[in-house]
């Protein structure tokens, strides 16, 4: 069953019925002011940090679902009937409904009782405000007298405190209303210099700023008293629940239309200009008022929306492809890079599965997000790398996350994840290949614990590698610490207390529990760093880290090979995990992908055998499982992984993040059909026809899909904020299509499915444009046999760097 369709020409997903299996959301904003919005206008907004600067409220896991948002109500003043153009929250039957989720904007349109309404929501580039543009048309044969009511419930800034500290918060809320603008200024008198505002372009028939006055006692968003009676209470909030509502009234002749603009925004005043007059408690509106006036104009809104769409066209021009597969085309050209931008901005902090309170910018997560983002906005990627490096500790370890507002690292989600530092090496390597900006390696960056002074980024990378090589276990494999990439494989935790966090509880000591996965990751990172060292003229460093990579590869093949696949780890007692000798948890996906990606097993047959084991033991029609057999009881020595019911999350689901590692590995060994087959299984567009099973959005990747051990096999969860986005873009574009940036040029080395006759692509790379045509005349899953650059045959598959501003014609033939 489908709930909509793709509009590829407009880069939109069109939802044609409002009752999607779960709310299907989109993100507003691209830089500092952000929001999530569902297909029925649910969601909320924040400035930079969804915990510390939350602008509007939203209630998770609530009944009814998706409660609270950017609501507009229309009321026929002649009959007294009212409804929501977005369906929620009134849920009246609509004669027509459509939601178009686009790139950083959402447009919801509907018709009821002969009145057509369209609401466009977006954040203009460079602004700290969002626009709600309402257009209403009278399609009746008679005049209509209408009222439009807006609704936005303010959060008292700190989302965690707002949801828990009621004894204080019921008495702190403050607002001002001036010239039709509602200003939310809780705590502005004392500790804050920022406020929110809510404005309307129409002369107001009324307003409300106290939620209970707007809704009425014991009423919900579905039947607000003010809307029902058609008259605002003109309430001014003092404590309780500050809320913003405007009442605009207008009359439309048959065929006439009306446009009303609502603005919800955030503003900061300089500390010495907070009040007007100085010394009073009255908000100084002089600086923000010109911004409000400008954006309440229709021509400003129209121009701002054009700029937003133009900016996305420019960003996505970094790579466009035309392949024989529509699902591939729309994901590569639009939705996958769009999701990569969202994960870059949000990390894992804010979605309908992440509350925006407990998680900030994850170290490991954001390093991997760079892989899919760097070609879109290299300058922003550079800034993120330096932020991440400043979260590193002098030991070479790193805080597991930091807050986006303060940039300060913290242990709120635990510490001692021993894979974290290695991802920084790979993130920097991806940036260097895309940009050639080796100057970043000389940039001085402080360590988060300030035990040493600022050091060049190059040294940070060295310490990342040393952190691993200094922490080896009995088999000379890396110690796992609290966990590696798999946060739920907690081999030093031994948690038996109900409610205790596996991520933050104290670990037992003893350097025994080892990770084969980190071994593969280290070999890959050390090899990449050796290449960086070579380019810096540091031959000794390069030789040393190549030797370290070889040593680790030897340890993995000696102690991490189980006969048909790579083992997963050794536990606190030195017992093997991920082995045929285990009753459950015999084979894990992570080391099969990572070890092969690092080159381990490519020359001795281990890689091919490990991938064959993946096909026979882990692959399903919905994707590749993380582990099999799933754990059926809780194992104290394994931790959180065994706490999940079989088939969910890390315990036997299709954990989509790891699937692309196997796609890359299959491409590396020349198996184009296998690589592309795995790609299609979790491609959201390819799963659109089973939306009633998949349930999550068909235009973005989800973190997990329930496995066959689960009652709801095929059901996705945790959509949007997942490393799946970056890694799938890497797998399809860099390894299956084979277009990947390298320091000395652009590699064109596809490994295609045999059914394809070829494809074309346009890649913007270091200022030049590469027009690429790949032909597969014999319909084989082979490698490039012939490569021509501007009509000249080139040996190998590396297209040399071209001068900025030039266009290069690349012709490749698979044979």
Could you describe each region identified by the protein language model?
Residues 320-334, 379, 383, 388-397, ...:
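Active-site acid/base region of carbohydrate-active enzymes
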Residues 788-792:
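Short strand-turn-strand beta-turns centered on an Asx-Gly dipeptide
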Residues 139-143, 269-271, 434-448, 526-545, ...:
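Inter-helical turn/loop segments and adjacent helix faces that build the functional surface
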Residues 741-772:
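Surface beta-strand/loop "capping" patches
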Residues 75, 361-366, 370-381, 385-479, ...:
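Aromatic-rich carbohydrate-recognition surfaces in CAZymes
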Residues 351-366, 409-419, 500-519, 575-602, ...:
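Solvent-exposed loop and edge beta-strand segments that line ligand/cofactor-binding
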Residues 149-151, 166, 399-401, 521-641, ...:
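Catalytic cores of carbohydrate-active enzymes
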Residues 1-365, 379, 384-387, 430-434, ...:
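Anionic coordination/interaction segments
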């Amino acid at each position: 069953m489908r709930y909509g369709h793709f509009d590829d020409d407009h880069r939109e997903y069109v939802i044609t019925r409002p009752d999607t299996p779960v709310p299907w959301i989109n993100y507003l904003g691209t830089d500092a002011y952000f929001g999530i919005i569902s297909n029925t206008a649910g969601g909320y907004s924040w400035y930079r940090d969804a915990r510390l600067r939350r602008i509007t409220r939203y209630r998770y896991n609530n009944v009814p679902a998706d409660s609270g948002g950017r609501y507009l109500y229309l009321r026929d003043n002649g009959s007294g009937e009212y409804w929501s153009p977005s369906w929620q929250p009134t849920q009246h039957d609509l004669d027509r409904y459509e939601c178009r989720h686009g790139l950083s904007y959402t447009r919801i349109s509907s018709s009821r009782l002969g009145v057509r309404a369209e609401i466009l929501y977006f954040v203009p580039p460079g602004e700290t405000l969002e626009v709600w543009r309402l257009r209403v048309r009278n399609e009746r044969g008679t005049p209509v007298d209408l009222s439009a009511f807006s609704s936005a419930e303010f959060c008292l800034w700190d989302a965690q405190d707002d949801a828990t500290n009621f004894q204080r918060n019921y008495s702190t809320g403050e607002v001002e209303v001036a010239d039709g603008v509602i200003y939310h200024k809780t705590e502005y008198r004392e500790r804050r210099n920022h406020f929110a505002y809510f404005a309307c372009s129409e002369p107001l028939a009324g307003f409300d700023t106290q939620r209970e006055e707007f809704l009425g006692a014991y009423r919900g968003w579905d039947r607000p008293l003010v809307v029902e009676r058609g008259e605002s209470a003109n309430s001014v909030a003092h404590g309780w629940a500050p809320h913003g509502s405007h009442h605009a009234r207008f009359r439309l002749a048959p065929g006439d239309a009306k446009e009303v603009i609502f603005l919800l925004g955030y503003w900061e005043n300089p500390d010495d200009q907070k009040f007007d007059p100085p010394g009073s408690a009255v908000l100084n509106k002089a600086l923000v008022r010109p911004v409000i006036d400008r954006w309440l104009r229709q021509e400003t809104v129209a121009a701002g929306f054009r700029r937003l769409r133009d900016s996305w066209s420019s960003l996505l021009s970094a790579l466009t492809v035309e392949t024989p597969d529509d699902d591939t085309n729309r994901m590569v050209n639009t939705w996958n890079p769009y999701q990569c931008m969202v994960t870059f901005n949000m990390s894992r902090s804010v979605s309908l599965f992440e509350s925006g309170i407990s998680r900030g910018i994850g170290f490991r997560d954001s390093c991997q997000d760079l892989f899919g983002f760097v070609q879109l906005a290299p300058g922003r990627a550079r800034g993120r790398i330096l932020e991440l490096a400043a979260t590193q500790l002098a030991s070479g370890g790193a805080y597991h996350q930091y807050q986006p507002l303060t940039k300060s690292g913290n242990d709120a989600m635990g510490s001692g994840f021993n894979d974290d530092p290695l991802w920084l090496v790979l993130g920097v390597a991806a940036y260097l290949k895309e940009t050639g900006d080796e100057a970043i390696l000389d940039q001085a960056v402080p360590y988060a614990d300030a035990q040493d002074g600022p050091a060049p980024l190059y040294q940070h990378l060295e310490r990342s590698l040393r952190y691993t090589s200094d922490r080896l276990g009995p088999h000379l494999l890396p110690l796992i610490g609290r966990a590696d990439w798999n946060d739920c494989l907690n081999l030093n935790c031994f948690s038996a207390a109900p409610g205790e966090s596996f991520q933050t509880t104290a670990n037992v000591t003893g350097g025994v529990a080892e990770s084969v996965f980190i071994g593969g990751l280290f070999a890959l990172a050390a090899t990449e760093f050796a290449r960086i060292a070579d380019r810096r003229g540091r031959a000794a460093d390069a030789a040393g880290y190549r030797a370290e990579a070889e040593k680790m590869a030897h340890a993995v093949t000696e102690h991490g090979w189980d006969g048909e696949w790579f083992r997963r780890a050794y536990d606190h007692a030195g017992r093997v995990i991920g082995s045929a000798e285990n009753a459950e948890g015999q084979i894990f996906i992570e080391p099969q992908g990572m070890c092969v990606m690092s080159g381990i097993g490519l020359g001795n047959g281990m890689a091919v055998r490990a991938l064959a084991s993946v096909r026979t033991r882990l692959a399903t029609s919905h994707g590749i499982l993380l582990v099999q057999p799933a754990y059926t009881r809780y194992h104290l020595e394994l931790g959180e992984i065994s706490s999940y019911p079989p088939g969910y999350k890390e315990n036997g689901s299709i954990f989509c993040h790891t699937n692309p590692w196997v796609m890359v590995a299959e491409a590396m060994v020349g198996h184009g059909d296998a690589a592309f087959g795995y790609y299609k299984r979790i491609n959201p567009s390819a799963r659109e026809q089973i939306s009633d099973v998949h349930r999550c959005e068909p235009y973005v990747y989800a973190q997990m899909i329930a496995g066959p051990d689960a009652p709801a096999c095929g059901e996705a969860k945790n959509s949007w904020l997942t490393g799946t986005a970056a890694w799938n873009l890497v797998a399809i574009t860099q390894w299956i299509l084979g277009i990947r940036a390298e320091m000395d040029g652009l590699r064109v080395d596809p490994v295609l499915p045999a059914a394809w006759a070829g494809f074309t692509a346009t890649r913007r790379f270091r200022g030049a444009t590469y027009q690429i045509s790949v032909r597969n005349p014999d319909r084989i899953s082979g490698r490039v046999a012939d490569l021509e650059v501007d009509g000249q045959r080139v040996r190998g598959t590396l297209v040399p760097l071209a001068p900025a501003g030039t266009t290069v014609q690349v012709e490749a033939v698979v044979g």
